Amino acid sequence: RNNKKDSRKTIVVSIMPCTAKKAEIAREELCDAGKLLNIEEMRDNDYVITTKELVQWCKEEGMDLGKITPSKYDSVLGEGTGAGMIFGNTGGVMEAALRTVYRVLEGKEAPADFYQLRPVRGLNNRKEAEVTIAGKNLKVCILYGTAAAEEFLAEDMSGYHFVEVMACPGGCISGAGQPDCGSVPVSDA
């Protein structure tokens, strides 16, 4: 809309670590662009390919990524953020959300020690932490795996303010659509 282009002619292809994203693009709640533009059939993403599929495609086409000359591109959303770098790790969504909440409620960036939320990152299938933002103590829980989520849902959840659940061990970085690169030692995660 801002570029004065017909949005129906734009095709959005997302490269994702997760095979579930292929099914998610058809979900009704994931068509905000269509709702905004009153185009019922429009989805936020038209196609999803996994990183594994992208690697396979590059190999099939004989592409050597190291020999490709960098070029300029139209950066619609900017270069990225620190939160974006950790988002695909177990605990990364939680940390990114807490960073944002801190900035909104406190009106400033959190101190460096606030970002050391090591208790919420890593490969344990359940982690908990408490943080203080704007004078309020917040209890958070990070889970991965449906078994851990099922156990959590059977408990009294009333003491928690925010819960993150990811299906894969370690988060999206270990998704089924990622290239096979062996197991990540727990100490390196």
Language-model features: locations:
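Iron-sulfur-associated redox domains of electron-transfer enzymes in respiratory
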Residues: 1-189
